[in-house]
């Protein structure tokens, strides 16, 4: 019994790839789709180029480090404490910002929880406010249009009245 369980736990390495290739009795599977081929053809050279750039950057970094190491060793009594102070200051600022963002988001969540509003309710409220505002703006536009029309008619009557007097003279 123990031998049977022990044999079941072992897998042959070839078993992991069985699902990738069709067996002799199975129907032949179509090749990759056109979009997959285009993705590979496009991304393979791009990935190779980026890998080349990464290698060049790494080599340049190593060369620069090899050339500047003697200067760092000579100036280390000054540079090491300065680097530690700058590193601690940057860490402090980043930590402060992270704690601030965490605190604000926590307070915001607590406020929403205490109000008992959920996102769908907030969306519905915003939708209603937008509709009310649109209706209010439409009403104002109608009123303004009527006012402009009335003033235009008044101006037209005034001009007609003035022209009539000029013709008489």
From Swiss-Prot:
Membrane topology: Multi-pass membrane protein
UniProt similarity note: Belongs to the oleosin family.
Subcellular location: Lipid droplet; Membrane
Chain ranges for the short sequence motif Proline-knot as given in the UniProt record: 70-81
Protein's recorded name: Oleosin Cor a 15
InterPro entries according to UniProt: Oleosin
Pfam families: Oleosin
Lineage: Eukaryota, Viridiplantae, Streptophyta, Embryophyta, Tracheophyta
């Amino acid at each position: 019994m123990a031998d049977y369980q022990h044999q079941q736990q072992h897998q042959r390495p070839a078993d992991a790839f069985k699902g990738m290739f069709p067996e002799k009795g199975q129907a032949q599977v179509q090749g990759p789709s056109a979009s997959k081929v285009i993705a590979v053809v496009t991304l393979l050279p791009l990935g190779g180029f980026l890998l080349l750039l990464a290698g060049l950057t790494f080599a340049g970094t190593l060369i620069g480090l090899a050339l500047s190491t003697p200067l760092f060793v000579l100036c280390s009594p000054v540079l090491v404490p300065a680097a530690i102070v700058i590193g601690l200051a940057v860490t402090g600022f980043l930590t402060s910002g992270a704690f601030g963002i965490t605190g604000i988001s926590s307070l915001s969540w607590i406020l929403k929880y205490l109000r008992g509003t959920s996102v769908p309710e907030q969306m519905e409220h915003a939708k209603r406010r937008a509709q009310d505002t649109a209706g209010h703006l439409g009403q104002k536009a109608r009123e303004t249009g009527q006012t402009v029309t009335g003033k235009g008619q008044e101006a037209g009557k005034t001009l007609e009245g003035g022209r009539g007097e000029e013709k008489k003279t």
